[in-house]
Curated annotation (Swiss-Prot):
E.C. no: 3.1.3.2
Chain's gene name: PAP23
Protein name as annotated: Purple acid phosphatase 23
Cofactors required: Fe cation; Mn(2+)
Gene3D superfamilies assigned to the protein according to its UniProt record, in alphabetical order: 3.60.21.10, Purple acid phosphatase-like, N-terminal (2.60.40.380)
GO cellular component: extracellular region
Length: 458
């Protein structure tokens, strides 16, 4: 069962699907509410098997695109990404040749009439482990094509692939967002995080798609490939735990491909923006981290002046989003801090009145799970968000929904952001139920699996 949360920013009110009235921040601080949950009823589900119909490879030929995804670049351009070829798992793996197949996107404003064509780049990556028993992995060919010249609030039809094979996808369509303006907003923005690939994940994503978002934001912890249980929820707690003497935990990389297939009905039609979580770190013996995440997702890093795709920003109508990286340097002498300060200083609130930040771990959290885990990041960056009057901060990591009063430095402040922890998107770890101290500080609802939906107007 999934709970849909609607946040209407005209009144900055939060309505739960349950028939209960929750105070708004419009009239200042409100008396905190907590709905208790019986821990014995805590629900979860096992990982979906790799041969599940929504996870397995469906194309007859590996030349045909799969795992198709859209991501915003600028207000008039969009990234189209997909995968071809077959990933390889084993002791000795040889990477595929990215130049062996083209990266093309045909697109236009009429069905079957593609007036515009663009070419892009392709890459592969490997996840390598030195220990006996652990499986190396090399990916399929990952394609990224930037399509531009897009008109706002317009439906486009597209196909992607290699026309010379020929191996082009079926026709798919998407609708562009409005240009940055105080008078124009995406009709609905969906926030979700901590997804994984369980039956609860399917419930969350199906419910999200039924609500027809025009933009999706995933606040980290996507595939849980590092915790995949090859025999479901039984036996060892993760794939590589069968090898206790290994110097490094392996992640089961085929779950990334399964996740891409699972998400394609959504990501191929709705631009989906991501930020990394702790489950995306995936360290290799060489010290490389975030390899899968970095190669698979196209994000507007360079477009927003960032030197890393682990943090970036973008506009969606009258909203400016900053996507913050919690697992890279965030101190006030570092590159991310300097980028954030520069980015926020350029925001014109007359054009984008709403300023929203996202990150994976919450700074404010009353649950025992991850309690004050990122206090150092808060101390480094919170003042900057407060100075530039960020309106809302969305986070995941803690598998329970929670919304704070406006706050700054642990003090109620009418100029501080509203902090929202999105809740559990359905992963294998289940929901969090224990508080760090006596409950009652803020509204909590944690017996269900979540995504959040944001409707905006000035």
């Amino acid at each position: 069962m999934t709970l849909l949360i609607m946040i209407t920013l005209t009144s900055i009110s939060l309505l739960l699907a349950a028939a209960e009235t929750i105070p708004t921040t419009l009239d200042g601080p409100f008396k905190p509410l907590t709905r208790r949950f019986e821990p014995s009823l805590r629900r979860g589900s096992d990982d979906l098997p790799m041969d599940h119909p929504r996870l397995r490879k469906r194309n007859v030929s590996s030349d045909f695109p799969e795992q198709i995804a859209l991501a915003l670049s600028t207000p008039t351009s969009m990234w189209v990404s997909w995968v071809t070829g077959d990933a390889i798992v084993g002791k000795d793996v040889k990477p595929l040749d990215p130049s062996s197949i083209a990266s093309e996107v045909w697109y236009g404003k009429e069905k079957g009439n593609y007036m515009l064509k663009k070419k892009g780049n392709a890459t592969v990556y490997s996840q390598l482990y030195p220990s006996d028993g652990l499986l190396n992995y090399t990916s399929g060919i990952i394609h990224h094509v930037l399509i531009d010249g897009l008109e706002p609030e317009t439906r486009y039809y597209y196909r992607c692939g290699d026309s010379s094979v020929p191996a082009m996808s079926e026709e798919i369509s998407f609708e562009t967002l409005p240009l940055p303006s105080k008078d124009a907003y995406p009709h609905r923005i969906a926030f979700v995080g901590d997804l994984g690939l369980t039956s609860n994940t399917t419930t969350t994503i199906d419910h999200l798609m039924e609500n027809d978002p025009s933009l999706v934001i995933i606040v980290g912890d996507l595939t849980y490939a590092n915790q995949y249980r090859t025999i479901g929820g039984k036996g060892v707690p993760c794939f590589s735990c069968s090898f206790p003497d290994a110097p490094i935990r392996e992640t089961y990389q085929p779950r990334w491909d399964a996740w891409g297939r699972f998400m394609e009905p959504l990501t191929s039609k709705v631009p989906t923006m991501v930020i990394e979580g702790n489950h995306e770190i995936e360290p290799q013996a060489s010290g490389i981290t975030f390899k899968s995440y970095s190669e698979r997702f196209a994000v507007p890093a360079s477009e927003s002046g960032s030197n890393s795709n682990l943090y970036y920003s973008f506009d969606a109508g009258g909203v400016h989003f900053v996507m913050l990286g919690a697992y890279v340097d965030y101190n006030n002498t570092g590159l991310q801090y300097a980028w954030l300060k520069e980015d926020l200083s350029k925001v014109d609130r007359a054009v984008t009145p709403w300023l929203v930040a996202t990150m994976h771990p919450p700074w404010y959290n009353s649950y025992s799970s991850h309690y004050q885990e990122f206090e150092c990041m808060r101390q480094e960056m919170e003042e900057l968000l407060y100075q530039y009057r960020v309106d809302i901060v969305f986070a995941g990591h803690v598998h329970a929904y929670e919304r704070m009063n406006r706050i700054y430095n642990y003090t109620l402040d009418p100029c501080g952001p509203v902090y929202i922890t999105i809740g559990d998107g359905g992963n294998i770890e289940k929901v969090d139920v224990d508080f760090a101290d006596d409950p009652g500080k803020c509204h909590s609802s944690y017996d269900l699996f979540f995504f959040n939906s944001l409707n905006l107007s000035n």
